[in-house]
């Protein structure tokens, strides 16, 4: 007699879809200060970023309200964005300031301006489908290491587009048991803390690439910006670094990933030696991170994963993450409460 196996239905629900509310990293701020407009394919549309003479970086909807031309293909002239199609000129706020062949400017001749901020030498853009600014305290934190000259203030950012839903990336925040199989990094301690818009991970272990005694506390500040502080013994040298892991959605099933690494100088070493150590450590972190990328590129989104008892707080994470996809007044008050979950603790007492 044959035994009929129970069928497991894989749920993958993406519609209707909205893009996450929060700050999203657009990379090194200085790259936008080159006197040119920059194309940004994000949030299911196209934006344009450009800097004015005072150094401020502005982000606007890229499609000209006149005839729909792409403003990111234009030029910058006297702090104005000039459309390549008819040379309409737009100011930093997105308002048309000049039409070369007409004195009267239509009142509707303006394009949307997006809220931006700079922090830690990085540019961020705010997305909120409701059109509201961030609430008090919803910020990208200033890293004190940016004020410390013992750190090499270079993020060494890599950029790539990945064809999967951004939640696949965020799931890693609670995935204690992939470190061994994917990274060769046995986990000795792993915990998560969720509080408001911040999701923390505390990791201890030993890494084949990044050295022994690895301690790596990290946090998502909103849905898309993740900083990790790393300390480890790398080739007999105590190394301290900060990783940047950020993404901006392009479509519901693709995102631009920015991965960066900033390293602290080792006392007693020359600048050349420190640069070599930093280069090696950045390479090691990059290789480790790309092991995750290889998985993300070839997996699908599953909304109802079958979990083992000790898989960690996957559903709690997704509940936390979901708050960024709903109207703010519908976010449960319980999201503000501190929740701590320890998944692995093999430390010797």
Where do the PLM segments sit?
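C-terminal catalytic domain of Rieske-type non-heme iron oxygenases
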Residues: 56, 134-349
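Non-catalytic accessory segments flanking enzyme active sites
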Residues: 12-13, 18-20, 182-184
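A general structural signal for short secondary-structure junctions and capping/turn motifs
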Residues: 15-16, 39, 115-117, 247-249, ...
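A broad, low-specificity signal for short, low-complexity segments enriched in glycine/proline
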Residues: 1-12, 45-47, 84-88, 161-165, ...
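Rieske [2Fe-2S] iron-sulfur-binding domain
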Residues: 3-7, 11, 20, 25-146, ...
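Short, mixed-charge, low-aromatic patches
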Residues: 15-19, 121-129, 246, 250, ...
